Regions:
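Terminal leader/tail segments of proteins
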Residues: 21-144, 148-185
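Classical Sec-dependent N-terminal signal peptides that target proteins to the secretory pathway
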Residues: 2-24
């Protein structure tokens, strides 16, 4: 009788405590294809933060920021965007250029280079499509629907591109704060 009671108390009080401690907020849940891509660049994959971007009443996309430490800033991170509606390639490229121009005034040759890079990085987007941007020190690698679509070492482009979502004075400070994990209690 005492053995059964002792075993019951262990199961009720001790084991759940262990599971609570091992279930951290920064574990990531992704499909296997995304995990395979991330495994090529990260030994550990910890969630810094996640956010949902909405414009008026449209649910545009969900974003996650991943690093090996679970902290940002980092020289190595992944930004994952899962789209919640369809977008044309042209509209995504145009809006991305608009966001980049809020950070820098481009001369004509610079703007043409940016357009070339963005046209290589983006495709027509369907609901639930996934875009992964990985900053790996001095280079960036972009995946669309598990296909590597762009690799660049253009540091200015890399920083401006990721700063659309990550800079302190972004267009949507609440979104950026959530993505950077600043809303954790």
């Amino acid at each position: 009788m005492h053995k059964k009671l002792y075993l019951f108390l262990i199961l009720i009080f001790i084991l759940p405590t262990h599971f609570v401690h091992s279930n951290t907020n920064n574990t990531i849940k992704e499909d296997q294809s995304t995990l395979n891509i991330l495994n090529n660049y990260f030994s550990k994959k910890l969630l810094v933060g996640k956010a949902n971007f909405q414009f008026l009443f449209w649910n545009m996309y969900d974003a996650k920021l991943i690093t090996e430490s679970g902290k940002y800033p980092s020289n190595k991170f992944a930004l994952i965007l899962k789209y919640n509606k369809d977008f044309s390639k042209k509209s995504v490229v145009d809006e991305t250029i608009n966001q980049l121009e809020k950070q820098k005034t481009f001369n004509e040759p610079e703007l043409e280079e940016v357009k070339v890079l963005l046209n290589r990085a983006f495709r027509d987007i369907k609901k639930n499509n996934k875009f992964i941007g990985i900053k790996n020190n001095d280079e960036a690698i972009f995946y669309f629907q598990n296909e590597k679509v762009l690799k660049t070492d253009n540091s200015e482009f890399i920083n401006l591109f990721f700063d659309i979502w990550l800079r302190k004075d972004s267009q949507n400070p609440k979104f950026t704060k959530e993505l950077l994990g600043k809303n954790k209690g």
